[in-house]
Every structure is written in C-alpha cells, then in structure tokens.
C-alpha cells in the first residue's frame, strides 16, 4: 500500500513539473527564414574588436560580479571588454541577462564582429531556459525553430 501511495505521489509531482516547464525554442512558430541547420552553419567564433580588459571576477567564475563588470565596461563604451565579460557570465555562470546583452551586441556589431546567426543562437538558448523576450527576439531575427 505504501508503494502505491508513493507511486501516486511521484506521478502527481512529476505531472506538476511537466506543466510548469518553460516553453522551449522548439515551440516557436515556423514563420521565420532560418532553419536550425542554416543557423548552425552561420555561427562563428567570437572575434573581439580592440583590446580587452579582463576581470578577476570573470576569471574566477563569479557570474554576478562578472556581469556587473560587463555593465560597467559597456557604459564606458569599452565594448570589447564588455562582450568578453558578458560571454564569461553567460557561458560560465548561466547569467541569462548577460546572454541577452551579448546577443544584442552581436546584432549591432558592438565590440564583436556583427553576426546575426550568433545573436539568434544566443537568443534561442536563452529562450529555451524560459526568457520570453529572448523568444520574441529570436523570431524577430527570423529563426523558425
């Protein structure tokens, strides 16, 4: 009897988890211009424009402090340093607002080589983790995933 109750409780718990899961980029409408394969073909390694100031916070994996450093560098118009720090906060610590900012920088070519495919990919990944604005931006740029 205890096993049956435990199984029912686990089933109810898992059903609740599934219904609250974030919507993924896979659920995006198929109205865009680019397929996933086309997107992956267009992604290029990050090429920074100018010299980079690095932060100890970013080197040590402190995502929140790294994002603060990136915001500071961005406000000083040191876009290469900001892009490098946003990348560290996004990739290393999963600070998704940093991913959004880096995607925007790829879109505009601020501190990095302008690359719409890199921007779409960052928006797509951030959308997968439940950031609705990222989903909207990804669709605006033409991703049909």
Which sequence ranges carry the predicted segments?
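Sec-dependent bacterial lipoprotein signal peptides
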Residues: 1-17
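Short helix-capping/linker turns of helical repeat alpha-solenoids
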Residues: 46, 59-63, 73, 92-95, ...
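Bacterial Sec signal peptide processing site at the extreme N-terminus
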Residues: 17-34
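Hydrophobic face of amphipathic alpha-helices that form TPR/SEL1-like repeat modules
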Residues: 66-75, 85, 101-108, 140-144
């Amino acid at each position: 009897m205890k096993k049956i109750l435990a199984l029912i409780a686990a089933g109810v718990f898992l059903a609740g988890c599934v219904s609250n899961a974030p919507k993924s980029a896979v659920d995006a409408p198929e109205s865009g211009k680019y397929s996933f394969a086309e997107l992956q073909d267009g992604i290029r390694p990050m090429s920074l424009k100018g010299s980079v100031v690095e932060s100890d916070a970013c080197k040590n994996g402190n995502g929140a402090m790294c994002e603060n450093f990136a915001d500071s560098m961005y406000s000083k118009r040191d876009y290469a340093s900001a892009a490098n720090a946003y990348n560290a906060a996004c990739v290393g610590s999963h600070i998704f607002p940093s991913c959004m900012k880096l995607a925007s920088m790829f879109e505009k070519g601020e501190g990095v080589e302008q690359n719409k495919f890199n921007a779409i990919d960052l928006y797509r990944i951030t959308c997968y983790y439940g950031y609705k604005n990222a989903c909207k931006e990804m669709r605006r740029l033409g991703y049909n995933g």
